[in-house]
UniProtKB/Swiss-Prot annotation:
It catalyses: uridine(747) in 23S rRNA + S-adenosyl-L-methionine = 5-methyluridine(747) in 23S rRNA + S-adenosyl-L-homocysteine + H(+). Belongs to the class I-like SAM-binding methyltransferase superfamily. RNA M5U methyltransferase family. RlmC subfamily. The gene is rlmC. GO terms for biological process: rRNA base methylation. Keywords: 4Fe-4S, Iron, Iron-sulfur, Metal-binding, Methyltransferase, rRNA processing, S-adenosyl-L-methionine, Transferase. S-adenosyl-L-methionine binds at residues 214, 243, 270, 315. It is an enzyme of class 2 (transferase). This is 23S rRNA (uracil(747)-C(5))-methyltransferase RlmC.
């Protein structure tokens, strides 16, 4: 991938950019192997890594806003502590550059003065732009210091929608603190539509403001599709999807299992109410029965259940599932575990704690090309 920003060192976020892509995959695979090297791999099948496109793969741009209201700069504060314009970043869909040009004009028309950190003055802190690969519609979020400019934004919104016809969801997020915090709790919708629909392997998934959603949709689709293929023929009647987010894993697995056994039951648990709303909407759109999603802490939910599932899916944050939940799963003894991780180091530690389980399949997913980060999926069975 050719990147002028990396060549001039104005942005070095893609730290592996000079490493050939095949070598990137080899290094990541080696790192993954090191994390599980002391575990029993006698029955483990290694599936070849799921590769990513090397450019244009991100569906979301998070832009720090600097400069002036007449000449805003959308991008990052780089390691030289300078604002860098990244509107033509090659990780984004090609059309984002043109959209950002329109947004710069909107910033001026709505009087959205970029927030000045040193002076603690101004209004506009970030612009967040997300695209649905399924239908090319867009979600646009303005992170503001206050609600002062909302009347002007509403006045100019019709003109913005004319220039960007795919604009489906527009919000103002209010983040009043003078701190390096991306977003505040208050989200004000400026459009009637409040969710962006994405579709992976025929399963509709919904993106909401403040909800987590994978930023590499092609690889995310591969991740969910692999999970679906691994479990579709397993003898599963009940499954839990802990840390379920918008329901990607649970819905893919439940849809495949219910195709063979209609009364398969899914329970999804996620601490974010916004994500649970999206997951429930997806289940309804899919026409799936015996599905429930609850807004709870996943570990606490599991520790307080009496019924026993046949399959437990865990997709924890970077810290992993931790010893209490691992020990609970050892004692609960579901026949199958499906573990998805964005941090192979903590996953390796968790798998050491899951002493009653043995890895059967594993696959690396290159969700973040040109960096050291990756996702991994492994299927475990009860010993």
């Amino acid at each position: 991938m050719n990147c002028p920003h990396y060549q001039t060192q104005t942005c070095i976020s893609c730290r592996w950019l000079e490493t050939p892509y095949a070598d990137q995959l080899t290094q990541k695979q080696t790192h993954l192997q090191q994390q599980i090297s002391i575990l029993d791999q006698s029955r483990l099948e290694w599936i070849p890594p799921f590769q990513s496109a090397q450019s244009g793969f991100r569906n979301k741009a998070k832009m720090v806003v600097n400069g002036t209201v007449e000449r805003p700069i959308l991008g990052i504060i780089n390691e030289r502590n300078q604002p860098a314009d990244l509107t033509d970043c090659p990780l984004y869909p090609a059309r984002f550059a043109e959209i950002f040009s329109v947004l710069k004009d909107f910033i001026g028309r709505a009087g959205l003065v970029p927030y000045n950190i040193a002076k603690q003055k101004g209004e506009l802190k970030y612009i967040l732009l997300t695209e649905s690969r399924a239908n090319q519609t867009l979600m646009l979020r303005f992170v503001l210091r206050s609600e002062t400019k909302l009347p002007l934004m509403r006045r100019e919104l019709a003109g913005l929608s004319t220039k960007i016809p795919d604009l489906a969801v527009v919000t103002a997020n209010i983040q009043p603190q003078h701190a390096a915090i991306l977003e505040g709790q208050k989200e004000i919708f400026l459009t009637e539509q409040q969710v962006l629909e994405e579709r992976f392997n025929g399963i509709p998934l919904f993106i909401r403001p403040q909800g987590f959603f994978q930023t590499n949709p092609a690889v995310a689709e591969g991740l969910y599709g692999t999970a679906q293929n691994w479990v579709k023929n397993l003898p599963v009647q009940r499954l839990w999807d802990l840390f379920c987010g918008v329901g990607g894993f649970g819905l893919h697995c439940a849809a495949a299992l219910q195709a063979n056994t209609p009364d398969v039951a899914l329970t999804g648990i996620e601490i974010s109410p916004s994500a649970i709303y999206s997951a429930a909407l997806s289940a309804e759109k899919c026409g799936l029965k015996n599905v429930s999603f609850q807004s709870l802490d996943a570990a606490n939910f599991a520790l307080n259940q009496d019924d026993k599932p046949d399959l437990v899916i865990v997709n924890p944050p970077r810290r992993g599932i931790g010893k209490p939940l691992a020990e609970f799963l050892n004692n609960l003894r579901p026949q199958f575990l499906l573990y998805s991780s964005c941090n192979a180091v903590t996953m390796g530690s968790d798998l050491q704690s899951l002493t009653h389980y043995q890895m059967r399949k594993i696959r690396l997913f290159d969700m973040f090309p040109h960096t050291a980060h990756y996702e991994v999926l492994t299927l475990l069975t009860l010993k």
